[in-house]
Structures are given as structure tokens and as C-alpha cells.
């Protein structure tokens, strides 16, 4: 393989150090390319199904695949039938693509064309779950032989369970940097902060010396301003935007 196994530890540590220094949206694509080259992979794909401040209908997708394959994949709506994406949205554990059911006609067509377009002979995916509902899937592919893949995939499983989350953190930093500032009142900030610490509306009201209905009003207006679907989501967005900090 391109990467000698005795260099894996160096590759891992160097990659972690680099990812921690990046924060711009353009850095995500650059980071994936560097990881691909450093680990001797065929391709890398990152799909964020849910991010603070971003609608489920507007997923973030960053890949190293060819432009032709990406265009075909979306033109033919292959994501709807992609068993890797489907499993990645409910699974908590990493999985090898060989574990995915490929019995369906549409699925066999998808994977057949993927190989033709150079996606890679083997693949592995790493589901990502954030503290406040953010959800993503990080995938790697390889063109190694079956024998070589069975030898190295355990090492990749070890490294990429961590690297996937570092890439996700980079995405969160990049997304935060591009979001327009949201202005919350001091009371809205206070209520959100205490909600983030697990307090109920009644408990927050007692802490702040205001009515429970007033507390709920502040939480609702904060949720609306942040474009959140609920208070938990509002807390996540407020943290990502550095509006609040959850510490006692």
C-alpha cells in the first residue's frame, strides 16, 4: 500500500495537529485531500445530515470523488437508495461496506457504477453524533486487494474513529465562522445558558427571580432568533456561535 504501516502513528498525530489549526470552510476540502494522500486512500467523503444552523434539507457534503461521479450520483438521486448513507444515519458504530446489504437491483447498480467511476473497491464509514443533535457520516475508500484491506482495516478503524470527529469539529468551526451574528437579549442568554445546564423553565424562573411564563417566553424568542427547532437545538446553536458557554 502507499502508506507503510510503521508510519501510521505519525500520520495520525500529524493529521490531528493539522485539523486542530484549521477553521475556514475551504479548509475542509483541503484537509480531506491531505488525509487521503497521507493514508494512501482512494477517496474520502463527509456528509453532514444535521448541523446547527443548517436545515435537514440542506446537508453539507464534502468529497474527493470525481466531479463526474458526484454529478451522476445527485442527478440520479442515488442518495435515496444508498445503503451506506441509510445505515450511517441510524448506526452508532463504524462499519465496513462489505457488511451492507447489496441484494437490491438499484443498490447493485449504484455500487457497480461507483466502481466504474473510481470510488474504490472497499469502503468503511464512521457515524458521527454530536452533543446537540448534529449528525454526520465520514467515509473512506480504498483500492487495495482483499487480502491487504483485511490486514489494514482494523488500523484504519482505530484511527478514523477519532479523525472523523476532528473533521466534524473543523466543519462546525467553519460553519460558525460563516453564520451571521445573532443578537439575543441578556435575559434570553441567561435563560438559554441555564437550559443548557439542564434546568427546567420553573427552575430557571426561580434562579433568575422571574415568572415561569416569562422564562418560557425568553426561551421561545431565543429559539426563534436562532432559527432552532426546539430549545435543545437553540442551546447547541448558541454554543456554536459563542453566545453562551456551558460552565458553572
Residue ranges and their predicted role:
Residues 64-116:
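Regulatory sensory and allosteric helical modules in signal-transduction proteins
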Residues 189-190, 233:
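Pre-recognition alpha-helix immediately N-terminal to the DNA-recognition helix
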Residues 200-233:
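Recognition helix of helix-turn-helix DNA-binding domains
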Amino acid at each position: 500500500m502507499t502508506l507503510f504501516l510503521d508510519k501510521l502513528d505519525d500520520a495520525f498525530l500529524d493529521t490531528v495537529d493539522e485539523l486542530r489549526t484549521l477553521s475556514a470552510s475551504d479548509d475542509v476540502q483541503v484537509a480531506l485531500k491531505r488525509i487521503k494522500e497521507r493514508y494512501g486512500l482512494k477517496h474520502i467523503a463527509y456528509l453532514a445530515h444535521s448541523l446547527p444552523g443548517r436545515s435537514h434539507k440542506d446537508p453539507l457534503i464534502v468529497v474527493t470523488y470525481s466531479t463526474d461521479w458526484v454529478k451522476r450520483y445527485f442527478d440520479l438521486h442515488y442518495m435515496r437508495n444508498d445503503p451506506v448513507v441509510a445505515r450511517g444515519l441510524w448506526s452508532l458504530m463504524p462499519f465496513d461496506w462489505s457488511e451492507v446489504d447489496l441484494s437490491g437491483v438499484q443498490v447493485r447498480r449504484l455500487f457497480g457504477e461507483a466502481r466504474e467511476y473510481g470510488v474504490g473497491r472497499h469502503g468503511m464509514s464512521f457515524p458521527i453524533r454530536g452533543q446537540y443533535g448534529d449528525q454526520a457520516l465520514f467515509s473512506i475508500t480504498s483500492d487495495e486487494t482483499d487480502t491487504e484491506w483485511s490486514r489494514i482495516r482494523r488500523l484504519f478503524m482505530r484511527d478514523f474513529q477519532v479523525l472523523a470527529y476532528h473533521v466534524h469539529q473543523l466543519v462546525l468551526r467553519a460553519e460558525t465562522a460563516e453564520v451571521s451574528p445573532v443578537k439575543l437579549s441578556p435575559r434570553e442568554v441567561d435563560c438559554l445558558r441555564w437550559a443548557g445546564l439542564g434546568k427546567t423553565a420553573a427552575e430557571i424562573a426561580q434562579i433568575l427571580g422571574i415568572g415561569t411564563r416569562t422564562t418560557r417566553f425568553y426561551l421561545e424568542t431565543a429559539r426563534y432568533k436562532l432559527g432552532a427547532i426546539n430549545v435543545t437545538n437553540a442551546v447547541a446553536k448558541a454554543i456554536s456561535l459563542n453566545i453562551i458557554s456551558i460552565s458553572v
